[in-house]
Curated annotation (Swiss-Prot):
Residues 95-105 have a biased composition (Low complexity). The keyword NAD does not apply. Residues 1-34, 83-133 are annotated as: Disordered. This is Protein Tat. It comes from Human immunodeficiency virus type 2 subtype A (isolate CAM2). One of its GO terms (cellular component) is host cell nucleolus. Its main location: host cell. Belongs to the lentiviruses Tat family. The modification Phosphoserine is found at S97. Residues 14-34 have a biased composition (Polar residues). Residues 53-69 are annotated as: Cysteine-rich.
Length: 133
């Protein structure tokens, strides 16, 4: 039988693992240091100016090649052509302003039947055999 006065022994393995550094903690320290270095590298790349890249491929690998490729190919953002926007000539602007006085519905309603009427008139003239012959 067990005596109530005898103290229970604590497992020695649990005490040893708490007091002594194990190989797990040293491995975790190494991975955290690597992650810290990687984070610093990413931040340094973030603040670098974008370099010109002449890669014209749009595959997934090339889209993530560098930050410029990601912006241009992956997201479709291109900052190169700000001043090359086509402008309408002044004559076209004057013509469009007179057309804008009419409502859109009247313009579309009037323009389509006029074309159909012209076609039907031409068709009837061609099919008429003429008078008295």
């Amino acid at each position: 039988m067990l005596d109530m006065e005898t103290p229970l022994k604590e497992p020695e393995s649990s005490l040893g693992s708490c007091n002594e550094p194990s190989s797990r903690t040293s491995g975790q320290d190494a991975t955290t240091q690597e992650l810290a270095k990687l984070g610093e590298e990413i931040l340094s790349q973030l603040y670098q100016p974008l370099e010109e890249c002449d890669n014209s491929c749009y595959c997934k690998r090339c889209c993530y090649h560098c930050q410029l490729c990601f912006l241009k190919k992956g997201l479709g953002i291109c900052y190169d052509r700000k001043g090359r926007r086509r402008r309408t000539p002044k004559k076209a602007k004057a013509h469009s302003s007179s057309a804008s006085d009419k409502s859109i519905s009247t313009r579309t309603r009037n323009s389509q039947p006029a074309k159909k009427q012209k076609k039907t008139l031409e068709a009837t003239v061609e099919t008429d055999p003429g008078l008295g012959r």
